Amino acid sequence: MVERTFSIIKPDAVERNLQGEVLAMIQGAGLKVVAMKMIHLTKAQAEGFYAVHRERPFFDSLTTYMCSGPVVCSVLEGENAISRYREIMGATNPANAAEGTIRKKYAVSLEANSVHGSDAPETAAFEISYFFNALEIVG
């Protein structure tokens, strides 16, 4: 089934200028970039995006980190895009990520793990609409 998912290349990867490498891995896995923008999140934007984690102990640290530098947001499209992108990303904790995944190759730590990706169709829909309107998505 062709579906869309949402991706963020996080501040640690952008700071190291890894956007090209990450996008090459994504496209190499057969996913198509149908929308993309680079932004510097405000604290309020990060808190709104990660609102589902508001009660978690890592919420403040995560939202502060996500505002620490520019990020690259994109909408990816392809067969089983959500599960395929999650496979390419690797485990949240880079120590547990499989060889050849984005997080195994590029993550610095559990928090600075280089990428974010939607985990379900409902979250993909929310996350895509949080950063993009329909006119910004081509495909």
UniProtKB/Swiss-Prot annotation:
Cofactors named for this entry: Mg(2+)
UniProt subunit comment: Homotetramer.
Encoding gene, per UniProt annotation: ndk
Family: Belongs to the NDK family.
Cellular component aspect of the GO annotation: cytoplasm
Lineage: Bacteria, Pseudomonadati, Thermodesulfobacteriota, Desulfovibrionia, Desulfovibrionales
Protein name, UniProt field: Nucleoside diphosphate kinase
Keyword Lipid metabolism: no
EC assignment: 2.7.4.6
GO biological process, one term: GTP biosynthetic process
Main location: cytoplasm
Xref: PROSITE patterns: NDPK, NDPK_LIKE
Subcellular location: Cytoplasm
Catalytic activity entry: a 2'-deoxyribonucleoside 5'-diphosphate + ATP = a 2'-deoxyribonucleoside 5'-triphosphate + ADP; a ribonucleoside 5'-diphosphate + ATP = a ribonucleoside 5'-triphosphate + ADP
Function: Major role in the synthesis of nucleoside triphosphates other than ATP. The ATP gamma phosphate is transferred to the NDP beta phosphate via a ping-pong mechanism, using a phosphorylated active-site intermediate.
Matches recorded under PANTHER family: NUCLEOSIDE DIPHOSPHATE KINASE, NUCLEOSIDE DIPHOSPHATE KINASE DDB_G0292928-RELATED
